[in-house]
Amino acid sequence: MFSDKDLRKLIVPLVIEQILAVLVGTADTVMVSYAGESAISGVSLVDMFAYMVITILTALATGGAVIVSQYLGNKEQENANRAAGQLMVGTLLASGVVCVICAALNSQILHLLYGSAEESVLQAAETYMFITAFSFPFLGIYNSSAALFRSMKKTNMTMYVSLLMNVINIAGNAIGIFVLKAGVAGVAVPTLLSRAVAGIVMTALAFNAKHEVYLKAKNVFCRNFEMLRRILKIAIPNAIENGLFALGRVLVTSIVAMFGTAQIAANGVAGSVDLIAIIVVSAMNLAVVTVVGQCVGANRYDEAEHYLKKMMKVSWIATAVLTVLVWLCLPMILSCFAVSEETYHYAYILVMLHNIFATVLHPTSFNLPN
């Protein structure tokens, strides 16, 4: 069902998209470090909580992508369009609720999770969380629209929009931190703007009737509880599974917050560098949904198993190679961050430990469940 050329055409843009995201994310953290360790600590605390929120929204997008891929595999285009419309409805409702809760209760949430952190860190975190909370609806519709394009194997579209989002983000951060000297707000506002632009552009593209699957107003604004139930049947278990994993990371970060600002900053720095080793496996997480979903929709279960094993093998090899490269370049990478010697030391240890376990466990923990 998928030739090697088809797989490369699907996966390579996803890998490039992940490379862009990791490079920009690391560059963001480097720039934030110049605003002080309180700033980078505050941002890292919120990013860890936001990771949990984004994981849940991504699970919803994945649920929709699975259903759409199955319909495409079974040549049911109209049902695929209906599923796409209901995916957007569910995404808007879920992300809207999350946005309101995070914006209204940001101080209470942060004090509950990270109350032992220094006051300067919490103030930075509150500012960052309040502003970026308004980006969740845009990020939600971006993820869902991008999932539709991946279902159609048009990953080049998501790559280009991701590039646009990342360029806006990194340029805005540079202006906010180095020109306007706006500190944490100088990082938060570009994040909001870049996600808003990406969400609007991606959704507008998804309404184009030239695509194999596209959004129709009648499918978005109607109530199709049966279709929504099918999406949620996949999305909810996925959200619980990945959400619990993300919650574990949040709880670990809340423990780290008790140790001091240097440790929080080191955790934030390590978190951005950690992503380098899992670039390929993260791209495979997205590709697996499309490949396996279409095979299952066409009742080709043997092929689904074959492709899954093939993609997991690539994930293991790529993660091992990237892990070695990160280890070799780690002193040079960490020297880019404007942090204390203590923070540098802790970050070094965290990256080393993460990459050891990621090489062994990441493909089975994420590729296989997808």
Segments from the language model and where they lie:
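Helix-terminus/linker motif at the lipid-water interface of multi-pass membrane proteins
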Residues: L23-S41, L110-E119, I175-A182, G243-I276, ...
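Small-residue-rich hydrophobic transmembrane alpha-helices
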Residues: I40-V100, L139-T158, T253, I264-L330, ...
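Membrane-water interface regions at transmembrane-helix termini and the short interhelical loops
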Residues: S145-K153, N173-A182
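Short alpha-helical transmembrane segments in multi-pass integral membrane proteins
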Residues: M1-L14, V68-S135, I177-I236, V292-F357
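N-terminal transmembrane alpha-helices
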Residues: F2-V30, Y34-A35, Y51-G63, I67, ...
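Transmembrane helical elements of multi-pass membrane transporters/channels
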Residues: K9-D28, I131, S194-A198, M202, ...
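Small-residue-enriched core segments of transmembrane alpha-helices in multipass membrane transport
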Residues: S162-N169, S272-V273
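Alpha-helical transmembrane segments and their lipid-water interface positions
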Residues: A21, G25-D28, V32, I54-A61, ...
